[in-house]
Swiss-Prot record:
Monomer. Residues 178-202 are annotated as: Disordered. PANTHER family: TRANSLATION INITIATION FACTOR IF-3, TRANSLATION INITIATION FACTOR IF-3, MITOCHONDRIAL. Residues 185-196 have a biased composition (Basic and acidic residues). PROSITE patterns: IF3. It holds the Pfam family IF3_N. IF-3 binds to the 30S ribosomal subunit and shifts the equilibrium between 70S ribosomes and their 50S and 30S subunits in favor of the free subunits, thus enhancing the availability of 30S subunits on which protein synthesis initiation begins. Gene3D superfamilies: Translation initiation factor 3 (IF-3), C-terminal domain, Translation initiation factor 3 (IF-3), N-terminal domain. It is found in: Cytoplasm. This is Translation initiation factor IF-3. Keywords: Cytoplasm, Initiation factor, Protein biosynthesis.
Length: 202
């Protein structure tokens, strides 16, 4: 029985960058590391210039005639590109909106479940749409729904900021919360009350 191959010979090769000796074109339009145009020169001459600069010759436009190369620090360039891609991905994630639905007569247990859901969404960097749903004549109790949403924003104030205060939207009342970017500064009265309580106990 023949030995099993150590790797799949038909598997696609990892895409390698077109830099230095991997560039096969005989003539190249070369841009120096400071942006200076070096004009159209031979591959060998371009490689020699890059070697003198202790940098890399990188193919940046293969479709041009002749192809365009730039002399640069490829390792630094690759790092910056990956950093920009990560930042772009992070920013795009923050645009998501998650929704938490409830009734204005919600009990304490279900309310805590909604608080936990909203907390999880906020920690993930998502905005939260808090929705109170009315059925039938319940629409008369918008004041109670507004009170509930304000209570929710208060309970989540350390993690969230109110982006849109409670307001009617059709047969619902909604409020938008966004992850808090700056720490919540507590009022002086809130920080001194525990100290007063300790003095009264002593």
């Amino acid at each position: 029985m023949p030995p099993r191959p150590r790797f799949d010979r038909h598997a696609p090769e990892r895409e390698l960058p077109n830099i230095n000796e991997r560039i096969s074109y005989s003539s190249l339009r070369v841009v120096d590391s400071d942006g200076t145009q070096l004009g159209v020169i031979s591959r060998e001459e371009a490689l020699e210039v890059a070697k003198e600069r202790e940098l890399d010759l990188v193919l940046v436009s293969e479709k041009a005639t002749p192809p365009v190369c730039r002399i640069m620090n490829y390792g630094k360039f690759k790092f910056e590109q990956e950093k920009k891609a990560k930042e772009a991905k992070k920013k795009s994630h923050q645009t998501e909106v998650k929704e938490v639905k409830m009734r204005y007569k919600i009990d304490q247990h279900d309310y805590q479940v909604r608080i936990s859901q909203a907390t999880r969404f906020l920690k993930a960097g998502d905005k939260v749409k808090c929705t109170v749903i009315f059925r039938g004549r319940e629409i008369q109790h918008t004041a109670l729904a507004e009170t509930l949403l304000k209570r929710m924003s208060k309970d989540l104030e350390e993690k969230a900021e109110v982006q849109q205060s409670p307001k009617r939207e059709g047969r619902n009342m909604i409020m938008f919360l966004t992850p808090r970017k700056t720490p919540l500064l507590k009022k002086e009265s809130e920080t001194t009350e525990p100290k007063k309580a300790l003095r009264s106990i002593n």
